Amino acid sequence: MLAIISSAKTLNFEKLAPKTELTIPMFLTLTNKLLSTLQSYSENQLSKIMNISAKLALINKERFKDFDNQESKAAIFTYAGDVFNNIHIEKLTNHALNFLQSHLLIISGLYGVLKPLDTIKPYRLEMATKLNEINLTNFWQDEVTNYINKILAKQENKYLLNLASQEYSSVINPNKLKYQLVNVHFKENRNGKLSRIGINAKKARGAMVKVIANNLIDSPELLKNFSYLGYAFSTKHSSDNELVFIKS
């Protein structure tokens, strides 16, 4: 089984990461192509296309301008936010971290896809951002889907577990994915209606990654006992391709 999660806008390069063997992102040639486009934008253009403040635009303009000389750090220890904070990566054993290295991918607008210990540099680029004529979803779709197919071909249980947002999981081409895609949904019962509460769903996704790592889980079936923040598996609302967890 291979799980996917979305990258995060928030990065933390200040927190120290444990010493471990780092890896290199798979698609650096394509990353550099995107960087060439990003480096051509003015601060004002970056502010508009990324919908960010002038201050953030200046920060990212400087990042892209001197990208090669920026510090780097393992992706799983760098991304912050609700999903990553609830993985509690700093508490994982080396064995659990090594398991994640071969069973988790992080989808990124700039890097396409990352293994947890792939090194990244400071950047901001959401998958929905349009760069001139480049649609990032289309730009990455074939490469990422083919890469996932190659990884799953070597896995014992050939499932792709989708813990990413719609914005990022859209980079997977279902028509070219050779193996079963299992989507995970976290919903809450509000006055008889099932709704997705974004912040709680993100926390639950991170907690599920932690459970996968700590228990070396390689099958969606083994996740049905997952419980966090009051979520519980719903047989009624689930199917072979959809795992639904409901909070009453």
Swiss-Prot record:
Top-level taxon of the source organism: Bacteria
GO biological process: response to hydroperoxide
Pfam families for the chain: H2O2_YaaD (PF03883)
Coiled-coil parts of chain: none
GO cellular component terms, A-Z: cytosol
The family this protein is said to belong to: Belongs to the UPF0246 family.
Entry protein name: UPF0246 protein RC0754
Provenance organism: Rickettsia conorii (strain ATCC VR-613 / Malish 7)
